[in-house]
Amino acid sequence: MTKRELPPGLRPETLAVRTAIERSQYGENSEALYLTTGFVQPDAATSAERFASGEGYTYARTSNPTVTAFERRLAALEGTEAAIGASSGMGSILMMIMGLLKAGDHVVLSRSMFGSTLNLFAKEFGKFGVETTFVSQTNVDEWRAAMRPNTRLLFAETPTNPLTEVCDIAALAQIAHDAGALLAVDNAFATPLLQRPVEMGADIVMHSGTKYLDGQGRVMAGALCASRQLVTEKFAPVVRTAGMVLSPFNAWVVLKGMETLGVRVKAHCDNTLAIARWLETQPQVARVYYPGLPSHPQHELAMRQQNGLGGGVLSLELAGDTPEAARAKAFHLIDSCRVLSIATNLGDTKTIISHPATTSHGRLTEAQRQAAGISQGVVRLAVGLEHHEDIQDDLLRGLSTLSA
């Protein structure tokens, strides 16, 4: 069919719906799902040319039209030249490290990152000679002091999981670039509807499409967004050889989920802010961690970076005389809920309640958890799209029977 070029200057909500629509000769209005491992070539010469150049579609491990559509749409939303999909968010991190680093290279990493990310750097990459220094998410001076002549990459997520710490992306970009290094930002919590890290100087934006991009907790997906040069020369050879490819079905599910990203993210943020404000009034809650609250240490920075919104995740802390007592309170609150789901994913339409110290960060050592500020009394809420008062009522079932 004749392709109509989109006009420039479209807003993110429109890009999430209209970008990367490639209709076949049948004129389908919904993006097509190409479930195939191989692509038939018209003749041997064309087959040889495509395999040699990497252009066109030959084999599903190297490229697929549905995956390409997902990549183009995400790149448009993030404002990068290109993007490349991966089987999961963790797969995209593996792709990034394999593509950029070698033995003897050094990475500076926030110690407040997702538990699996911390484990990957602390336990796995060291086996291959990659050196890592963990620093405070919010202390720019620590990032600067950690730089070495062999530092090649700075990596942060903002806001963090689960305590929603926010880093100064522009400041970290300056530190990285002054040293000839790159800055990568995990943008899964914020999504490009709240912040676009490349506009603040980041070189690479990492995504777990499993979360808000999908939006309904259905499939695993990951991606890296960056310059065309980084994607084609550094990342694509890794993912196509190592095989952490994004399946076309998962790409299609996330592609369709992205169409409602604008309305969903705003609703998540509104719900979460209402619940965070309410939790601050509850005597049983010692502290609420949410960037949308003025009480958050990085509130002003978050509002500047995140389009004036706080995101869809908060954590609350329950105090106890001992760690065991605090954990007992947290478990009681979680087990008292009848509406909320006890799980560990986020970005879902359903509100998810979890205990990070024994789930997402359970494989960390106690010292690592303490360094990240994750106590036994911390409970994370990945707020969904239910009515916020129903979520509050569900939490009150447990809170009302706890002592302050």
Regions found by a protein language model. Give the residues of each.
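N-terminal glycine-rich, Lys/His-bearing helix-loop that initiates the first secondary-structure elements
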Residues: 1-54, 404
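PLP-dependent enzyme catalytic core of the Aspartate aminotransferase-like
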Residues: 2, 122, 131, 145, ...
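Conserved PLP-enzyme active-site core in the AAT-like
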Residues: 2-7, 16-22, 82-283, 289
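Glycine-rich beta-alpha junction loops
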Residues: 21, 37-41, 189, 211, ...
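Conserved N-terminal alpha-helix of the aminotransferase class I/II PLP-enzyme fold
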Residues: 38-91, 116-123
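A common structural junction motif
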Residues: 242-243, 335-345, 398-404
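Short, well-ordered beta-strand elements within core beta-sheets of diverse protein domains
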Residues: 254-263, 311-323, 380-384
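Conserved small-domain helix->loop->beta segment predominantly found in fold-type I
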Residues: 273-350, 364-370
